């Protein structure tokens, strides 16, 4: 039998894990790594082996960035489109860029044509914007990118 957690239960589990020595950073590495391994196992035969993550400002965005880094290590091409994330001093973004990932800023260089091309030529799309902290009504930019 599968067990699903509510948002409140998930936050409680994470808080308790952190209090018992499993840091939020380690949880993020674990989540991103396991997502990448699953993607690689399920979609390894895709041609091209490319992944695009929509990366928001929360922990879900961090999970997505870790997954992209792991996919690069596994031979994938990876792109990230950041949405409402301050990335200039973000260590996960810097790691992703050092590994050869392509970064697009929804509010900067990610034109409609670039995004359309990315969406059409990527094998896997990772949602790194809507996590447990997501609230309805979505910000106009977020709703627009999800329309793709």
Language model features by range: what are they?
Residues 1-49:
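Positively charged, low-complexity intrinsically disordered leader regions
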Residues 1-5, 44-148:
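Glycine-rich phosphate/dinucleotide-binding loop and adjoining beta-alpha-beta core of small-molecule
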């Amino acid at each position: 039998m599968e067990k699903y957690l509510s948002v409140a239960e998930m936050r409680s589990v994470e808080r308790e894990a952190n209090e018992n020595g499993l840091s939020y950073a380690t949880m993020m590495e674990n989540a991103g790594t396991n997502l990448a391994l699953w993607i690689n196992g399920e979609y390894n035969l895709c041609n091209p082996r490319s992944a695009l993550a929509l990366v928001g400002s929360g922990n879900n965005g961090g999970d997505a960035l870790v997954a992209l880094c792991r996919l690069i290590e596994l031979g994938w091409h990876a792109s990230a489109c950041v949405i409402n994330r301050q990335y200039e001093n973000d260590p996960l973004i810097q790691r992703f860029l050092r590994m050869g990932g392509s970064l697009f800023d929804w509010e900067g260089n990610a034109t409609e044509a670039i995004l359309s091309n990315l969406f059409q030529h990527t094998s896997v799309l990772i949602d790194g914007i809507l996590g447990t902290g997501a609230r309805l009504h979505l910000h106009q930019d977020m709703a627009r990118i999800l329309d793709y």
